[in-house]
Amino acid sequence: MQRQVVFATSEMYPFSKSGGLGDVLGALPLALHRMGVPTAVVTPFYGRLRTADYPIRLTVSDCHVGYPWAPITCDVFEADYHGMPVYFIHRGEYFDRRYYYNDHKGDYFDNCERFVFFCRALLALMRRLGQPPAVLHAHDWQTALVPAFLYFLRQGDPFWQDTRSVLTIHNLAFQGRFASRLFETSGLPPQAWSVDGAEFWGDFNLLKAGIAYADKVTTVSPSYAREILGPAYGSGLDGILRKRAHALHGILNGADYDIWSPGNDRFLPCRYTPTDLAGKAQCKRALIEELGLDPHLARRPILGFIGRLRGQKGIDLLLDILPRLMESDVGVIILGEGNLTHEARALELMEAYRGRVCTIVSYTEDLAHRIQAGSDIFLMPSRYEPCGLTQMYALRYGTPPVATAVGGLRDTIVPWPSPESTGFTFGRCESAAFLRAILDAVHLWTTAPGDWQGMVRRAMAQAFTWERAGRAYLDLYAQLGVSPGEEGA
């Protein structure tokens, strides 16, 4: 039996998704699978799991999840996703809920218990299936204990001797930080409770444990890997990251162009390509009509924002400068939800500038596609951005971004006025700098249509493919001395 790369994740599109993590885990494993790498994914069986297009079946019943004090069982279901197995850990008391991590009251009180269980259940499933993986690849705090458990299992269990671990950090700010008493019930050995392990200012930090014990740690862009080594972006973990700097790598995410491409997008009223951009203008007119914007905006630039309405995404900067933008006779579309104060303010501005500003406090996948296609300029004023996917989508849709020069935004946007420019960036994450960059974009759109069309075509030619990212991960696995696909014992 060939040894697999097994991905551990709390989300995987199309089965579950709350943000970019789900998109990545819906694409990267599949890219490796299509490259001939034996690959599997393990994820929770949520109460609102979307399985209509991929029927699931019970594959393991009463899988015993070993805890020091008592065995707990779970059932495991399986789906065939384009020929790749996806396993779903089912235990109703932990995962049969409307939302993944929180509800309107806040984070679920038992999140630590839920995801400690998931990590242990994944390892129990691998034992039950009888074949140790070549690589266990965990993602974010929810699965960060997989590398930690593996580190200690390898010291005494021959089954795991040749398995290596990778932890990918999608957003360092979310760490899974819990009360110290929960460490005692996690099943990690006492020696893991140290300043170089799972302990963080007296708390149990799941992500820190993964960083400490994974064989390799990656982030989702090269720039973010460098940024988190310092206190400005390190979220308190820059110390442990500097200690593990030799194991830290930045690998840029890809974009799923099977889903996000204006030449084959089923959500668009008209498709278009770099050689035939007429359809983009038609998408713009259709979007203006759909959202009830003033028809004259068909002849003016429309600025689109898609993202969580939270401080990290810089929505407050956009709301601060929006009245000033209205003086330039532009349209603004905001799609997202998040902080209630930001939501209310965005809705108030829509009322104040009815017909020129549209705020949709929700997220729908189809409308996101139409905003990418129908906007002229895409706004992404993030205070930090580990990678970012929406700017990659904007580039492919010929909607040059205006973005902060941080993290993955720095790695994916060539800033104007370079002859190879694909968008606009600004250095200081503040309202004045953001406004200047937007006005530069509006000026170019208005006064130099030929230069603008050149930028649009260059943007659409960018190719941040998952195959490229997959090859980078295969190189990383090779550094660990493992070759997925080799026959196991």
Curated annotation (Swiss-Prot):
Gene Ontology BP, a term: glycogen biosynthetic process
Superkingdom: Bacteria
Pfam families: Glyco_transf_5, Glycos_transf_1
InterPro entries associated with the record: Glyco_trans_1 (IPR001296), GS/SS (IPR011835), Starch_synth_cat_dom (IPR013534)
CDD domains: GT5_Glycogen_synthase_DULL1-like
Pathway involvement of the protein, from the record: Glycan biosynthesis; glycogen biosynthesis
EC number of this enzyme: 2.4.1.21
Stored HAMAP family: Glycogen_synth
Name of the protein in its database record: Glycogen synthase
Designated gene of the protein: glgA
